[in-house]
Swiss-Prot record:
It is an enzyme of class 7 (translocase). It catalyses: ATP + H2O + 4 H(+)(in) = ADP + phosphate + 5 H(+)(out). InterPro entries: ATP-synt_VA_C, ATP-synth_a_Xtn, ATP_synth_asu-like_sf, ATPase_a/bsu_AS, ATPase_F1/V1/A1_a/bsu_N, ATPase_F1/V1/A1_a/bsu_N_sf, ATPase_F1/V1/A1_a/bsu_nucl-bd, ATPase_F1/V1_b/a_C. Produces ATP from ADP in the presence of a proton gradient across the membrane. The V-type alpha chain is a catalytic subunit. This is V-type ATP synthase alpha chain. GO terms for molecular function: ATP binding; proton-transporting ATP synthase activity, rotational mechanism; proton-transporting ATPase activity, rotational mechanism. NCBIfam families: PRK04192.1 (NF003220). It comes from the Bacteria. PROSITE patterns: ATPASE_ALPHA_BETA. It holds the Pfam family ATP-synt_ab_N. ATP binds at G228, P229, F230, G231, S232, G233, K234, T235. Keywords: ATP synthesis, ATP-binding, Hydrogen ion transport, Ion transport, Nucleotide-binding, Translocase, Transport.
C-alpha cells in the first residue's frame, strides 16, 4: 500500500508527496477522515488528487493512502429505482446511516448486501463460459435482470448454486480455476465495456414529441444535444424523453443542476405508469444526483458512472437512454480542476482537452452486438447550458461537432409560450436518411416526402416573415399569405406540444403522420382554390381549420376515425367553395 502526505490543498485538488509507485486514476483515501479522491496527474513522487468530497478542514501533513484500484461501480441487481450520488453511493442508505446531510468519508456499498434475490441458473457444471455470457436471471420490477460473466473472465463451470434466494455477496457460480462469480461485479468507469461489434443506427429512438420524431429524429444508439439558455425548457424536455421514450431503461444524471429538478423526477416518476411493464416509471430508472451544491470534482465522475451503468444494461440486451443534465456543468468542473492544477487554459479558460473528453463520453453511445450475442443500445442525450444562450461558446461548439442530432432551444420561443421551444431553423439531425427505410416500412410509404414538405413550408414561411416585418402582410399575394397561414398552423397545431396534457404529452408516429397529412391536404386544396380565384379570406373562414387544430388533443384510439372524417371534410369544404 502506497502512503504519502498532503503537501498542498487547492479547493477540490490535493497535492501529495511520497506517492512513488501510485498509478493514474487510482482511488485514494485522503486525510484522517478518509475522503475519496482520484489521482489525475503524476509528477515524480508527487500525485495530484481530485477529491470527491468537501475538503474543508484538511491539513497539510495528513496521510494520503492509494488503494491501488481505479474508480469503479458495482453492477448487479438492485440499481433500478435507486438514487445515487456522483460516485455511486446510495443516498437513501446514507440518509438512514448519517441523516439528511452526507457525512464526509462515509462508506456505504452501492448495492444492498442484505436483500435476497430469486436466482434461476442458466448454466450447468462443465459449461465453458466467457465474458458477457448469461449465468442466470433474477426478476427485478418486472424486468428479467441477467447476471453476466464479467467481460474479462473466462473458464469452465465447476459448481452452480441451485435456484433459490441469495444475496449479491454469495457466490452463485464457481469456475474450475477457483474464480467465484457473484451476482454483481465491479467495472472501472473510465473504461468502456467491450462489445463484439457496433451496428449501423437504423431504428429510431422514439420520444413521443412530434418535432423531434418527425423533423429531427435520433437513432437508437445515437447521440443528441439540447443546448439552450436558462428557462428554455431543457430539463422538462429531458424529463419528457425519460417518461415517454421507447427505451427499456433510463439513466438520468443530474450533473451540477439544481436539486429541485431531481426532486421533480423523484416526485413525478413513481406516479407515472410505464407502458411496457405497467409498473411505476421509477422502476425502470436509475438516478444519479450530483447537484450544484455537491462537490465539483464528483460532477466529472457522475457522467462516467452514469454511462457505465447504461453500458451494463445494454450488455443485457436492453435499449438504454442516458440523460445528462447538463454537460456544461461537467465542463465547468473540468475547467476548475484544470485551473487548480495550473494547466495551460484554452478558449474561455476551458482546458485544451475539453473536446477530447466530450468526444470520449459521447463515443460510448451506440447500437451494438454485445459479448453475449444480444443486441443492445445506449442513446445519449446531453443538455448544454451556454451562458446567456451564446451558441458560439466552447462547450456548445465542441458538442456540435460530435453529436448526430442537435436540438436547439430558443429563449424567444419559450417567452412566446411555444413549447417544446426547439428552433426548427437552427436544429438538425444527421440520422434522417438512415431512418427513412424504417419509416417507409413501419409508418407509411410516403412519410419521408410529407416530412420534407412540412420542412420546406416552414423554411418558406421563415423567409416570408422577414418581408412581412418590413412591409406588412398586405404586400403579399394570396398564395404567399397562404404559406404564412399554413406555417402558423404547422407551428401551433403540430410542433407545439403540452408536456402536462394527458393526451398531448405523447404522440405516436401514426398520429403525427395523420396530422401532417391533414395539414398538407388542406394546403394542397387551398393552393388549387387560390389558382381558381377563391380569396384567401374565404379559405381562412372554413370550419375545417378548427378540426385540424383539435387533432392533437384526440386520443390514440379515436384518432383513426377522426382522421377519416377530417379528410372528407377538407375535400367537401373546398368543393363547396368552388
Amino acid at each position: 500500500m502506497i502512503q504519502g502526505v498532503i503537501q498542498k490543498i487547492a479547493g477540490p485538488a490535493v497535492i501529495a508527496k511520497g506517492m512513488l509507485g501510485a498509478r493514474m486514476y487510482d482511488i485514494c483515501k485522503v486525510g484522517e477522515e478518509g475522503l475519496v479522491g482520484e489521482i489525475i496527474r503524476l509528477d515524480g513522487d508527487t500525485a495530484f488528487v481530485q477529491v470527491y468530497e468537501d475538503t474543508s478542514g484538511l491539513k497539510v501533513g495528513e496521510p494520503v493512502v492509494s488503494t491501488g484500484l481505479p474508480l469503479a461501480v458495482e453492477l448487479g441487481p438492485g440499481m433500478l429505482n435507486g438514487i445515487y450520488d456522483g460516485i455511486q453511493r446510495p443516498l437513501e442508505r446514507i440518509r438512514e446511516k448519517t441523516g439528511i446531510y452526507i457525512t464526509r468519508g462515509v462508506v456505504v456499498h452501492a448495492l444492498d448486501r442484505e436483500k435476497k434475490w430469486a436466482w434461476t441458473p442458466m448454466v450447468k457444471p462443465g459449461d465453458e463460459v466467457r465474458g458477457g455470457m448469461v449465468l442466470g436471471t433474477v426478476p427485478e420490477f418486472g424486468f428479467t435482470h441477467k447476471i453476466l460473466v464479467p467481460p474479462d473472465v473466462r473458464g469452465r463451470v465447476k459448481e452452480v448454486k441451485p435456484a433459490g434466494e441469495y444475496t449479491v455477496e454469495e457466490p452463485v457460480v464457481v469456475l474450475e480455476d477457483g474464480t467465484e462469480l457473484k451476482m454483481y461485479h465491479t467495472w472501472p468507469v473510465r473504461r468502456a465495456r467491450p462489445v463484439q461489434r457496433k451496428l449501423d443506427p437504423n431504428t429510431p429512438f422514439l420520444t413521443g414529441m412530434r418535432i423531434l420524431d418527425v423533423l429531427f429524429p435520433v437513432a437508437m444508439g445515437g447521440t443528441a444535444a439540447i443546448p439552450g439558455p436558462f428557462g428554455s425548457g431543457k430539463t422538462v424536455t429531458q424529463q419528457s424523453l425519460a417518461k415517454w421514450s421507447n427505451a427499456d431503461v433510463v439513466v438520468y444524471v443530474g450533473c451540477g443542476e439544481r436539486g429541485n429538478e431531481m426532486t421533480d423526477v423523484l416526485v413525478e416518476f413513481p406516479e407515472l405508469t410505464d407502458p411496457k411493464t405497467g409498473g411505476p416509471l421509477m422502476h425502470r430508472t436509475v438516478l444519479i444526483a450530483n447537484t450544484s451544491n455537491m462537490p465539483v470534482a464528483a460532477r466529472e465522475a457522475s457522467i462516467y458512472v452514469g454511462v457505465t451503468i447504461a453500458e451494463y444494461f445494454r450488455d443485457q440486451g436492453f435499449s438504454v437512454a442516458l440523460m445528462a443534465d447538463s454537460t456544461s456543468r461537467w465542463a465547468e468542473a473540468l475547467r476548475e480542476i484544470s485551473s487548480r492544477l495550473e494547466e495551460m487554459p484554452a478558449e474561455e479558460g476551458y482546458p485544451p482537452y475539453l473536446a477530447a473528453r466530450l468526444a470520449a463520453f459521447y463515443e460510448r453511445a451506440g447500437k451494438v452486438i454485445t459479448l453475449g450475442g444480444e443486441e443492445g443500445a445506449v442513446t445519449i442525450v446531453g443538455a448544454v447550458s451556454p451562458p446567456g444562450g451564446d451558441m458560439s461558446e466552447p462547450v456548445t461548439q465542441s458538442t456540435l461537432r460530435i453529436v448526430g442530432a442537435f436540438w436547439r432551444l430558443d429563449a424567444s420561443l419559450a417567452f412566446r409560450r411555444h413549447f417544446p421551444a426547439i428552433n426548427w431553423n437552427g436544429s438538425y439531425s444527421l440520422f434522417t436518411s438512415a431512418l427513412d427505410p424504417w419509416y417507409r416500412e413501419n409508418v407509411a410509404e410516403d412519410y419521408p416526402e410529407l416530412r420534407d414538405a412540412i420542412s420546406e413550408l416552414l423554411q418558406r414561411e421563415a423567409g416570408l416573415q422577414e418581408i412581412v416585418q418590413l412591409v406588412g402582410p398586405d404586400a403579399l399575394q394570396d398564395a404567399e399569405r397562404l404559406v404564412i397561414e399554413v406555417g402558423r398552423i404547422i407551428r401551433e397545431d403540430f410542433l407545439q406540444q403540452n408536456a402536462y396534457h394527458e393526451v398531448d404529452a405523447y404522440c405516436s408516429m401514426k398520429k403525427a403522420y395523420g396530422i401532417m397529412k391533414m395539414i398538407l391536404a388542406f394546403y394542397k386544396e387551398a393552393e388549387a382554390a387560390i389558382k381558381r380565384g377563391v380569396s384567401i379570406d374565404e379559405i381562412l373562414q372554413l370550419p375545417v381549420l378548427e378540426r385540424i387544430g383539435r387533432a392533437r388533443y384526440v386520443s390514440e384510439e379515436e384518432f383513426p376515425a377522426y382522421f377519416e372524417e377530417a379528410m372528407k371534410e377538407i375535400q367537401g369544404a373546398f368543393k363547396a367553395l368552388a
